[in-house]
C-alpha cells in the first residue's frame, strides 16, 4: 500500500514519495509533507530555472539557490519563475 501524505502544495491527501529527495531537515520535511505529484511539478520548475538562468550545478552558489527555491516553492509561498515563461493555454 502506498504511503499517503497531506500534501502542503496540492492541499489534498496524495501518494507520498518513497524516500526523502534531499538530505537533512529540508529533505525530511519535504518527504513528510509533499506528494509525488507536487514533487514532479517542482522538478519541471527546477529544470526551467536551471536552463533559463544558465545555472552551473557544479557551482555551490547555484545549488544553494535551488535549495532556497525549493523551500520557497513548498513552504514560503512561491519560488522564482523562469523569466519570460508563458504557460500554454488551457484546453
From Swiss-Prot:
GO cellular component: cytosol
Keyword Disulfide bond: no
GO biological process: cellular response to oxidative stress
Pfam families: Iron_traffic (PF04362)
Cysteine pairs bridged by disulfides in the record: none
Tagged with keyword Mitochondrion: no
Any one GO MF annotation of this record: iron ion binding
Keyword terms of this UniProt record: Iron
Biological role stated in the UniProt entry: Could be a mediator in iron transactions between iron acquisition and iron-requiring processes, such as synthesis and/or repair of Fe-S clusters in biosynthetic enzymes.
PANTHER family per UniProt: FE(2+)-TRAFFICKING PROTEIN-RELATED
Family the entry assigns: Belongs to the Fe(2+)-trafficking protein family.
Name assigned to this protein: Probable Fe(2+)-trafficking protein
Highest classification ranks of the organism: Bacteria, Pseudomonadati, Pseudomonadota, Betaproteobacteria, Burkholderiales
